[in-house]
Amino acid sequence: DSNNELIIRELMPIYEKTGIKERPEIWVVMGLFNIASKVQEIIQNCKKELLIALPQGAENIVDIIQATLRTLSEKGVKIAVLVSDDTSKETILTISRVAEVRVKNNMFGGGVIGDINQVMILLGNGRNEKGNVEPIAIWANHIGLTGFAKEYFSYLWSDASSK
C-alpha cells in the first residue's frame, strides 16, 4: 500500500504538469582563465552548431581552440565565426579551414553559442573583489537567453561580409 502511495505521489505532479521546474543557470564569470575554461567546455560539448563572435583583440584565442574546432568540424558540427574588421588575414585564413568566417566592422564584445543550449557573452572588463580589473562574461543555459543570443548573432552575421 505504501508503494502505491509513493508511486502516486511521484507520478501525479507529472500527470498534472505541476512538478517543480528546474531553474536554468545564469552565472557571472570573471577572469580570463575561468572564461576560457567555460568557453572550452561549451565548444567540447557541442554536437550540431557552434557560433562564435570573436571580439577585437582576441586573436590569440584562435590558436588555443583551433584543434578543438578542427575535431568538431570533422564530426560534422556546423561552425560559424564572426570576426572584427581588425582581425589579421592569417587568423581569418586559419579559422576558415574549419569554419565559415565573416567579418563585421564595429563589432563590440563577443561570445560563444553551443547548440543553442549554452551561451557565453563577453561583456568587457570589470573589477573583482580585490579591485583588480579582469574580463567579465555571463554564461547561461537559459533557453530565452540562448535564443536571443542566436537571433542577435544571426542579425550580425547577415550584415557581415564574407572573406
Predicted regions and their residues:
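A short, well-structured juxtamembrane/interface segment
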Residues: 31-38
